[in-house]
């Protein structure tokens, strides 16, 4: 019997990536072959994103393209999974009846059954990586208990559910056996890890246990400013293989807007938290995300945000314009700002951040730092420092002369120039072996 072949397109965030990797491992165990070209596949499976409007549009466009391939006889089946069917399954079934089946975010056994495979719980820790082999994501929880008024994630992903700590350690061991050296911890909210199962945070315990496993870099993404366990910052300071980096989306600083967003935090709370983090670990680099143009945001409130960003000097910052999300509570609010005005505010904030980032990056000039090589061409290596998460942060563009470098290896680099989003320099030597995480 010919082997069934599957082309999987994973859209959206790193949490989706992990879901796709789990599915591919289960499929491989059932002798379903994963292919990289659509024209080699029997089935196209699209893992969709529905977080913002642009993501929804991309998901729809990819579905239509897949259906074209089915009509042309290139593939036999098209399946769609993930966040978009979780919100719009009935509408999608009516509008796109040629799709063979739609699946939500918690239907892995049903997806496998449609592919002619059986879900095997003993393979939960197994993943076929879609990332480069030297880094991977470790999803430490599912769902979200926060009630942010602009967000539909709780409706898409359900209530917060921490993954068992020992299970995460087994999964991390599997990843290490596959050659992963950089582990990026992710969730909708890492701050609450363990609260639902033990009544207290287990994030620091998890970090310590992972640090003992001798990963070269361990990185924390998607912290929430409420309930964040500050002992984690002490561990970050004391353990050399835990990156001095924290991604903590703050969204805004104005108290009225924070209340309307239902963030559960004030500007004063936020300033105290950031100050405490920097006091405990002076080497920490902070990434955040801001949402501008929330319904009712005045020019004065936006300028307060500009002042806040200038004062706090975030190392990395992303910014999005507010858009009504159909299943989010804030969709009931009157949205008076034009798209053009929101985009102008995004540009203004990012222009300010450019100046901040340029200033902070100049501090690296003349210094040696550790980097990982993600890729290289001719005599230019594209690298990241411990302060840069994959895909979203800065790059280090480094020459390496006659050295024989390898993608996925770690090196010492001398920085001699910088811009807002890049560091420039040269690779000096390979990272010395045997560095202890203690």
Curated annotation (Swiss-Prot):
Its EC number is 2.8.4.4. Binds 2 [4Fe-4S] clusters. One cluster is coordinated with 3 cysteines and an exchangeable S-adenosyl-L-methionine. [4Fe-4S] cluster 1 binds at residues 13, 49, 83. It is found in: Cytoplasm. Coiled coil: none annotated. Residues 130-359 form the Radical SAM core domain. InterPro entries: Elp3/MiaA/NifB-like_rSAM (IPR006638), Methylthiotransferase (IPR005839), Methylthiotransferase_CS (IPR020612), Methylthiotransferase_N (IPR013848), Methylthiotransferase_N_sf (IPR038135), NA-bd_OB-fold (IPR012340), Ribosomal_uS12_MeSTrfase_RimO (IPR005840), rSAM (IPR007197). Its main location: cytoplasm. [4Fe-4S] cluster 2 binds at residues 144, 148, 151. GO terms for biological process: tRNA modification. It catalyses: L-aspartate(89)-[ribosomal protein uS12]-hydrogen + (sulfur carrier)-SH + AH2 + 2 S-adenosyl-L-methionine = 3-methylsulfanyl-L-aspartate(89)-[ribosomal protein uS12]-hydrogen + (sulfur carrier)-H + 5'-deoxyadenosine + L-methionine + A + S-adenosyl-L-homocysteine + 2 H(+). SMART domains: Elp3 (SM00729). Catalyzes the methylthiolation of an aspartic acid residue of ribosomal protein uS12. This is Ribosomal protein uS12 methylthiotransferase RimO. It comes from Chlorobium chlorochromatii (strain CaD3).
């Amino acid at each position: 019997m010919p082997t069934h072949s599957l082309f999987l397109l994973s859209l959206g965030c790193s949490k989706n990536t992990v879901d796709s990797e789990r599915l591919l491992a289960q499929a491989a165990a059932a002798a379903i072959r994963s292919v990289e070209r659509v024209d080699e596949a029997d089935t196209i499976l699209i893992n969709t994103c529905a977080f913002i409007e642009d993501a929804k549009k991309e998901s729809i466009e990819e579905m239509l393209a897949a259906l074209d391939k089915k009509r042309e006889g290139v593939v036999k089946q098209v399946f769609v999974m993930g966040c978009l069917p979780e919100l719009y399954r009935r509408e999608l079934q009516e509008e796109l009846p040629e799709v063979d089946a739609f699946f939500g975010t918690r239907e892995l056994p049903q997806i496998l059954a449609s592919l002619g495979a059986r879900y095997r719980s003993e393979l939960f820790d197994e993943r076929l990586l879609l990332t480069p082999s030297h880094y991977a994501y470790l999803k430490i929880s599912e769902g979200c208990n926060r009630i942010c008024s602009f967000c539909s994630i709780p409706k898409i992903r359900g209530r917060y559910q921490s993954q068992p700590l020992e299970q995460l350690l087994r999964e991390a061991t599997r990843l290490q056996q596959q050659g992963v050296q950089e582990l990026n911890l992710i969730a909708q909210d890492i701050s609450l890890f363990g609260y639902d199962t033990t009544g207290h945070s287990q994030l620091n315990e998890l970090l310590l246990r992972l640090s003992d496993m001798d990963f070269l870099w361990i990185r924390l993404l998607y912290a929430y400013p409420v309930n964040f366990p500050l002992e984690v910052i002490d561990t970050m300071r004391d353990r050399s293989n835990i990156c001095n980096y924290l991604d903590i989306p703050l969204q805004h600083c104005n108290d009225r807007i924070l209340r309307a967003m239902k963030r559960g935090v004030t500007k004063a709370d936020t300033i105290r938290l950031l100050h405490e983090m920097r006091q405990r670990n002076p080497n920490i680099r902070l990434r955040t995300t801001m949402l501008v143009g929330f319904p009712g945001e005045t020019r004065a409130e936006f300028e307060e945000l500009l002042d806040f960003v200038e004062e706090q000097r975030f190392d990395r910052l992303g910014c999005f314009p507010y858009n009504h999300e159909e299943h989010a509570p804030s969709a009931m609010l009157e949205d008076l700002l034009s798209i053009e005005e929101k985009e102008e505010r995004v540009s203004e904030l990012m222009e300010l951040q450019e100046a901040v980032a340029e200033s902070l990056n100049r501090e690296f000039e003349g210094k040696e730092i550790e980097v990982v090589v993600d890729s290289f061409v001719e005599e230019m290596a594209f690298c990241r420092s411990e302060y840069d998460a994959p895909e979203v942060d800065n790059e280090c563009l480094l020459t390496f002369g006659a050295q024989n470098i390898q993608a996925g290896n770690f090196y010492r680099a001398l920085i001699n120039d910088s811009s807002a989003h890049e560091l420039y320099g040269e690779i000096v030597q390979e990272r010395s072996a045997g560095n202890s995480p203690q």
